[in-house]
């Protein structure tokens, strides 16, 4: 079992968000998973230019580090999403990475994978970031196990969150191992599946990769 953690804070080793992602990964490792941490802020990932090439070929033509990182995420069983709260949303580094995954959401490539989200804020708005990240993951077909955050303005908040983060890592491993189903998330998955089934069918003569992906999955029935 492999779990990958994505950190989108520009603070590097000093990042509070990195501390929480690392704590989740520690809990997952203790529960038996192999882990990897990716620093999206250090990675060379440019903006999506909306060329549509990934719809046709399955590969982004921009010559940077996105394809390699994304391949490792797709190969993992679980994903830990981590971003600081910037103006009640994710950091620019995280949004840039997410925006490069149009092919991923079209093809529901997180189907069968499990994830969770963490965030750190100066105030209480980290929950909005956690909900956003889990929402993105579910929209891509994944199952969200949970999420948490911390406020640096509240004494003891980070320490408490780190303890909970380790527990969340263990819970993530359990969910993957048992193939846990979250009934409340199924309507989201069905809605996304139907939406993109229609879209891919509509563009089947142009989006060869995506049409063949759906066909091979048996989702076009």
Where are these regions (language model features)?
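Short beta->alpha junction loops
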Residues: 39-42, 148-154
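Short, glycine-/small-residue-rich phosphate/pyrophosphate-handling segment
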Residues: 92, 105-151, 158-160
